[in-house]
Amino acid sequence: MSDSSELVMVAMSGGVDSSVTAMLLLEQGYNVAGVSLQLKSNNEPYGNGYNLKLINRAREVAAALNIPHYVVDLSDIFSQRVIADFCQQYSQGRTPNPCIRCNYYVKIGALLNKIQDFKADYLATGHYARIVSDENGTHLLRGADGKKDQSYFLYTLPPESLSRLMFPLGQKYKKDIVRLATNMKLPVSQKESQDVCFIPDGDYKSFLATRMGFTPGKILDTTGKILGEHQGLPLYTVGQRQGLGLASNEKLFVSDMNADANTITVAGHDQLYTSRILLSNFIWRESGIPLDTSGMIVKVRYKAAPAEVKKISQSGDFYILELASPVWAATPGQAAVIYLDDMVLGGGIIESGGDTI
């Protein structure tokens, strides 16, 4: 049992994971309070009340657990750091991962500062990831449940943040969490969280259309030949095949998008493989990038199969990742996260891929 004088604030959405997180901490003897995030400002059209539904559901769970529940307004920083960047990235023909920025700036970054107002000792979330401390520092590890592991979305968190965080589900499996919630009759939603919480209906086109114009442009092949016309860069992503409107005997995929020229380049499936990736905003969590990359792997998307890392080298403000075997459709704007066994070593944002890097 823990020291009951330690206050742990649990980021609660009313879902299974955060609700069981609060319950487990109570069982461990912590003084627990729930906190939900107000992320939608009154002048924002997105969400259709989705954020309010989450807050109300979290309040019901907190009442069932007999713990205090608070709401903190982080709508300004969410709008500035997450939504504005999301739109800007899409306008440049990139495919961002807003969850990574949200964790760093909002759900964990800003919330860690806010809970100081409540004199809280720790912030706990329902992420499936682990935190381990030893003589070499504090480390971020994969969650035990490989199918639910969320360490990919947390790779930017600094060690000083990890030291004030708890991930009680890190050693758990999703099926067991659902069973616990059912047995305790917690008033939770069994639905999985939305990929992008501020677009709960998944209609990216409508969301982006309220914030930017779509300018049609040319679709080219790799020789520069015009094959057709696209409807606007934000509507496409590297690796996309559907919706191109091209008549071709060959299956063609988006291989590159040039925001300056407002063009999309398409190529055959095999031409999207690359074993060299250029990364920006590179972060290395451990002490020094070793010359020996034996055992290191990288994920170039959350659901991507891992690829073996051959070499990591610096090129000005960027880093070049060389892989032992090629990956398909390394997408600008997505994160490439590097692991050694279960430990998150670092990562960066994909700028481009190809042998000419």
UniProtKB/Swiss-Prot annotation:
Its EC number is 2.8.1.13. Residues 148-150, 301-302 are annotated as: Interaction with tRNA. ATP binds at residues 11-18, 37, 126. Disulfide bonds join 102-197. It catalyses: S-sulfanyl-L-cysteinyl-[protein] + uridine(34) in tRNA + AH2 + ATP = 2-thiouridine(34) in tRNA + L-cysteinyl-[protein] + A + AMP + diphosphate + H(+). The keyword Secreted does not apply. GO terms for molecular function: ATP binding; tRNA binding; tRNA-uridine 2-sulfurtransferase activity. Signal peptide: none annotated. The record marks 127, 334 as: Interaction with tRNA. It comes from the Bacteria. It is found in: Cytoplasm. It holds the Pfam family tRNA_Me_trans_M. The active site is at 102 (nucleophile), 197 (cysteine persulfide intermediate). Belongs to the MnmA/TRMU family. Catalyzes the 2-thiolation of uridine at the wobble position (U34) of tRNA, leading to the formation of s(2)U34. This is tRNA-specific 2-thiouridylase MnmA. It comes from Dehalococcoides mccartyi (strain ATCC BAA-2100 / JCM 16839 / KCTC 5957 / BAV1).
